[in-house]
Amino acid sequence: MENIMTLPKIKHVRAWFIGGATAEKGAGGGDYHDQGGNHWIDDHIATPMSKYRDYEQSRQSFGINVLGTLIVEVEAENGQTGFAVSTAGEMGCFIVEKHLNRFIEGKCVSDIKLIHDQMLGATMYYSGSGGLVMNTISCVDLALWDLFGKVVGLPVYKLLGGAVRDEIQFYATGARPDLAKEMGFIGGKMPAHWGPHDGDAGIRKDAAMVADMREKCGPDFWLMLDCWMSQDVNYATKLAHACAPFNLKWIEECLPPQQYEGYRELKRNAPAGMMVTSGEHHGTLQSFRTLAETGIDIMQPDVGWCGGLTTLVEIAALAKSRGQLVVPHGSSVYSHHAVITFTNTPFSEFLMTSPDCSTLRPQFDPILLDEPVPVNGRIHKSVLDKPGFGVELNRDCHLKRPYSH
């Protein structure tokens, strides 16, 4: 009988943060909203807070960047480490070091599903179905997958069963789809700038933006509109129809996450041929099952927020059983290793984090080292052929560890 590899146990889990409310803005990293001045991502973009004039001009004005980046590292008893980043900051550090550590340390590095289930169960009474706690659990889960891959010497996508395609093709999210086209992306997703409080004038302005970009990009380049939970059903329906003449491919996250009936109605009333998408701010498999039942066309979980890679794999299987697509929200290498194994993810998202969208900057810069970016809008699977997620932690980022155990 052949020898079976003996896997080590997890000896330590540690949590750091960078950025957040007490830091100078512009730390970047896992909290990619934390950018410096004159950045498109902090421009006049429609949000649930836009109806308040004091908070409509900038997303940082209402505190979108107060959490900062959470970094979780797990260390095996043989000294190997895995890590991941997400958006949870100092509060996420507390949850990891003071609560979740008991479910991690002492377990085998392969006990990812067991640890995941225990973290979900133990936090259920204070986590709800998403938000800060789910971001933290996601970060731990991703760190565990990174460690497991490094211990066995395989990239995460091979742990999931291997690639189903040779490369990932991307659309770009940012303010300049025309520049994205020049870089080889298959499409560009723009932020909506106006909402229900702006009335029909807001609809006309955003439709005019789409029309202008259609003229610049030509008839075949995909154009999409990201509404970031800022609308109601009536406004979103009107906006979708106003943009239909310009061949808008989809309209995204128009409504708050829990408005499932609203999504059902929006899908029913959207223009023929225009897709309705959402899921970025949903967490847990159960919430995605409810979202899937609304009939939307694409579910868009963020692997750093939805429950981690373990949950993302479950969401993809759920969507596949219903004939729906899963196109994760951003998330760089943490998504790349997943989507290249999903048959119902024919393309993926690349988030433009350069201030004016004129250059390709890694999404989680500067916290990750060796983070790949698309070349001509694509990443070949060979780029992912490194153990774990294939990136390293930049320890020059002044990591802060506020708690220990």
From Swiss-Prot:
Record site feature (Transition state stabilizer), residues: E349
Keywords assigned: Lyase, Magnesium, Metal-binding
Name used for this protein in its record: L-rhamnonate dehydratase
Miscellaneous comment as given in the Swiss-Prot or TrEMBL entry: Reaction proceeds via a syn dehydration.
Gene3D superfamilies on file: Enolase-like C-terminal domain, Enolase-like, N-terminal domain
Catalytic residues (positions): H329
Subunit relationships: Homooctamer; tetramer of dimers.
Top EC class for this record: lyase
One matching Pfam family: MR_MLE_C
Molecular function GO terms recorded: L-rhamnonate dehydratase activity; magnesium ion binding
Binding site for Mg(2+): D226, E252, E280
Domain of life assignment: Bacteria
Positions bearing the site annotation: Increases basicity of active site His: D302
Catalytic activity: L-rhamnonate = 2-dehydro-3-deoxy-L-rhamnonate + H2O
Reported cofactor(s): Mg(2+)
Family of this protein: Belongs to the mandelate racemase/muconate lactonizing enzyme family. RhamD subfamily.
Described purpose of this protein according to its UniProt entry: Catalyzes the dehydration of L-rhamnonate to 2-keto-3-deoxy-L-rhamnonate (KDR).
Organism: Salmonella paratyphi A (strain AKU_12601)
UniProt binding sites for substrate: H33, R59, E349
